[in-house]
UniProtKB/Swiss-Prot annotation:
Record family assignment: Belongs to the peptidase S1 family.
Keyword annotations of the record: Disulfide bond, Hydrolase, Protease, Secreted, Serine protease, Signal, Zymogen
Alphabetized SUPFAM superfamilies for the sequence: Trypsin-like serine proteases (SSF50494)
Listed Gene3D superfamilies: Trypsin-like serine proteases (2.40.10.10)
Organism: Manduca sexta (Tobacco hawkmoth)
Signal sequence interval, chain numbering: 1-17
Catalytic residues (UniProt): H70, D115, S213
Residues marked Required for specificity (site): D207
Disulfide bonds: C55-C71, C180-C197, C209-C233
Name this polypeptide is given: Trypsin, alkaline C
Tissue specificity annotation: Midgut.
A GO biological-process term: proteolysis
CDD domains assigned to the protein according to its UniProt record, in alphabetical order: Tryp_SPc (cd00190)
Subcellular location: Secreted, Extracellular space
Length: 256
């Protein structure tokens, strides 16, 4: 889920929490939770009563969910819940309250470096064909350029467009780090070594978007990225940017 928040004033689209107009996977198609049992919908409430899908996450084990730090950053724990085991953003499956949220200690909200967090649920996530722990890329996981990766989520189907109540997925490709860094440097944005770029470079039309923040990016079924930010959505020149999971393998293990 990428969101337009305060950074929008700088011309920067962050895949942040609580979108004013949440957006979904661009250029993909509908799918089911049975195809992606490791993904969960993160629900947010402004008033503590009415919750709506605002970010995505990945099941680590029966009590912990991986997401983007910018989703829960600055919020009270009781503003967030986790919906597991459902194809649909706002119905079905099981809904879990949270006990705690752990933000990466080096998270930088200005450039979204180290944009990673772990939510601990108050109740166990029951595993079945619609809810399973994910395989997380290890520190030495080899992921080259132009590799097929898949993104999934409940974000917008176009930048500024309507939400998708049903889970969607899209095939994109990993983008060379130097190329991605250069493209974003041209508009004053920083791509660090902790980030992983993906999209359909110089073609566009496929991407994660607002509402997909925190959700997984898969390579051969292994989670290699956490949806973080981008310049609008699905632009030919600017790929999407994820937190690079291989940089956080130890931190994830030690905190879940």
């Amino acid at each position: 889920m990428r969101l337009f928040l305060a950074l929008l004033a700088l011309g920067f689209a962050a895949v942040a929490a609580v979108p004013a107009n949440p957006q979904r996977i661009v250029g993909g198609s509908t799918t089911t939770i049975q195809q992606y049992p490791t993904i969960v919908a993160l629900l947010f409430s402004r008033n503590g009563n009415t919750f709506f899908q605002a970010c995505g996450g990945t099941i680590l084990n029966n009590r912990n969910v991986l997401t983007a730090a910018h989703c829960p950053h600055g919020d009270a724990v009781n503003r967030w819940r986790v919906r597991s085991g459902s194809t649909f953003a706002n119905s079905g499956g099981a809904v879990h309250n949270l006990n705690s949220v752990r933000i990466h200690p080096n998270y930088n909200r200005r450039n979204l470096d180290n944009d990673i967090a772990i939510m601990r649920t108050a109740s166990n996530i029951a595993f079945n064909n619609a809810a399973q722990p994910a395989r997380i890329a290890g520190a030495n996981y080899n992921l080259g350029d132009n590799q097929v990766v898949w993104a999934a989520g409940w974000g917008a189907i176009r930048s500024g467009g309507p939400s998708s109540e049903q889970l969607r997925h899209v095939q994109v490709w990993t983008v060379n780090q130097a190329t991605c860094r250069s493209r974003y440097a041209s508009i004053g944005r920083t791509v660090t070594d902790n980030m992983l770029c993906s999209g359909w470079l110089d073609v566009g039309g496929r991407d994660q978007c607002q509402g997909d923040s925190g959700g997984p990016l898969y390579h051969n079924g292994v989670v290699v990225g956490v949806c973080s930010w981008g310049e609008e959505c699905a632009l030919a020149r600017f790929p999407g940017v994820n937190a690079r999971v291989t940089r956080y393998t130890s931190w994830i293990s030690n905190n879940s």
